[in-house]
Amino acid sequence: MDLITPDFGIIFWQTITLLFVLFILGKFGWKPILQTLKKRETHIEEALKGAEEAKQLLAQLKSEQEKLLEKSNREREKIISDAVATKNDILETAQMEARQLSDKVLKEAREVINTEKEIAFGKLKHEIFLISVQVAEKLLEKELNTENKQEELVRRLIKETHLN
């Protein structure tokens, strides 16, 4: 047991050595160690502040990105609606022009048909007139082949003209 319990001299010298080591550490070691710890603590705080600022910046950028996305979506919808409106206007204009052209062509066709119809009726009347004259000529030749009949017709025509 003697080996386990230290002597008074050993305790004394160990205490002196410990105090000397503490003095040396206090004089030369603690200040650099504390400064290093302080620097590390400051560095960690700055890193945390930087991380927080980065987080805020990221949130701000995300918010701006969402706003830009919304704006671009609105612009896209506006462009699409404008394009649809323009398409509808163009289609409506084209349909109206097609209708006008169709009406114009129909009107011209009707005019041509009416003109040709009038020409055909004129030719038909002329043909009927010529046929009537030929028939009348043939009838008159048959009826007026004698001189008595010719004189009788002339007298009758004179009487009718005086009466009218």
UniProtKB/Swiss-Prot annotation:
<protein>
    <recommendedName>
        <fullName>ATP synthase subunit b</fullName>
    </recommendedName>
</protein>
<dbReference type="InterPro" id="IPR050059">
    <property type="entry name" value="ATP_synthase_B_chain"/>
</dbReference>
<comment type="subunit">
    <text>F-type ATPases have 2 components, F(1) - the catalytic core - and F(0) - the membrane proton channel. F(1) has five subunits: alpha(3), beta(3), gamma(1), delta(1), epsilon(1). F(0) has three main subunits: a(1), b(2) and c(10-14). The alpha and beta chains form an alternating ring which encloses part of the gamma chain. F(1) is attached to F(0) by a central stalk formed by the gamma and epsilon chains, while a peripheral stalk is formed by the delta and b chains.</text>
</comment>
<dbReference type="InterPro" id="IPR005864">
    <property type="entry name" value="ATP_synth_F0_bsu_bac"/>
</dbReference>
<dbReference type="GO" id="GO:0005886">
    <property type="term" value="C:plasma membrane"/>
</dbReference>
<dbReference type="GO" id="GO:0046933">
    <property type="term" value="F:proton-transporting ATP synthase activity, rotational mechanism"/>
</dbReference>
<keyword id="KW-0406">Ion transport</keyword>
<comment type="function">
    <text>Component of the F(0) channel, it forms part of the peripheral stalk, linking F(1) to F(0).</text>
</comment>
<dbReference type="GO" id="GO:0046961">
    <property type="term" value="F:proton-transporting ATPase activity, rotational mechanism"/>
</dbReference>
<keyword id="KW-0812">Transmembrane</keyword>
<feature type="transmembrane region" description="Helical">
    <location>
        <begin position="8"/>
        <end position="28"/>
    </location>
</feature>
<keyword id="KW-0138">CF(0)</keyword>
<keyword id="KW-0066">ATP synthesis</keyword>
<dbReference type="Pfam" id="PF00430">
    <property type="entry name" value="ATP-synt_B"/>
</dbReference>
<keyword id="KW-0472">Membrane</keyword>
<dbReference type="InterPro" id="IPR028987">
    <property type="entry name" value="ATP_synth_B-like_membr_sf"/>
</dbReference>
<dbReference type="GO" id="GO:0045259">
    <property type="term" value="C:proton-transporting ATP synthase complex"/>
</dbReference>
<comment type="function">
    <text>F(1)F(0) ATP synthase produces ATP from ADP in the presence of a proton or sodium gradient. F-type ATPases consist of two structural domains, F(1) containing the extramembraneous catalytic core and F(0) containing the membrane proton channel, linked together by a central stalk and a peripheral stalk. During catalysis, ATP synthesis in the catalytic domain of F(1) is coupled via a rotary mechanism of the central stalk subunits to proton translocation.</text>
</comment>
<keyword id="KW-0375">Hydrogen ion transport</keyword>
<keyword id="KW-1003">Cell membrane</keyword>
<dbReference type="InterPro" id="IPR002146">
    <property type="entry name" value="ATP_synth_b/b'su_bac/chlpt"/>
</dbReference>
<comment type="similarity">
    <text>Belongs to the ATPase B chain family.</text>
</comment>
<keyword id="KW-1133">Transmembrane helix</keyword>
<keyword id="KW-0813">Transport</keyword>
